[in-house]
């Protein structure tokens, strides 16, 4: 299914990177984590309210492929490579239709991903007015775009090399 494909593609993409590219990708991912930390700090008061009154609405009845994809898996596997086995187990429950998030522990929560290794949408979506943290959200999104451009450039380089050799 879609997520399984994205996960396997992320794994093979990471395996194909040179040591220098892995180092650069790790640096980009650390920048994402720093942006996430800034966002969490700026949103701490509202996040505390959100978590205290959490009903899990943001993880229920969702189309998971709209929340997590290839670049999210590249990010997660880079910063939390030990999650492979857990992710693979969750992917066995992927549905074609809207369902609760398959990455919730025991199907209820909390999320299996560590706080500093979550998909972009999960990092930047809130159940409260996010105007006070718009700049921090933009920063996280900008850094995820940098990650996607980096990966795309490596894929294009690999494709060009295979065409001309």
Kindly label every feature range from the protein language model.
Residues 1-165:
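Hydrophobic scaffolds flanking metal-cofactor catalytic centers in soluble metalloenzymes
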């Amino acid at each position: 299914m879609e997520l399984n494909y994205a996960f396997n593609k992320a794994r093979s993409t990471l395996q194909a990177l040179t040591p220098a590219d892995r180092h650069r990708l790790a640096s980009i991912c650390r920048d994402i984590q720093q942006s996430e930390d800034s966002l969490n700090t700026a949103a701490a008061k509202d996040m505390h309210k959100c978590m205290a009154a959490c009903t899990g609405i943001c993880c229920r009845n969702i189309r998971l492929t709209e929340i997590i994809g290839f670049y999210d898996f590249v990010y997660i596997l880079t910063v939390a490579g030990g999650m492979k086995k857990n992710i693979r187990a969750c992917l066995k429950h992927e549905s074609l239709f809207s369902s609760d998030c398959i990455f919730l522990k025991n199907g209820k929560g909390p999320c299996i991903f560590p706080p500093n290794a979550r998909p972009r949408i999960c990092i930047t979506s809130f159940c409260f007015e996010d105007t006070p943290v718009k700049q921090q959200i933009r920063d996280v999104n900008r850094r995820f775009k940098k990650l996607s451009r980096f990966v795309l450039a490596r894929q294009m380089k690999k494709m060009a090399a295979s065409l001309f050799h």
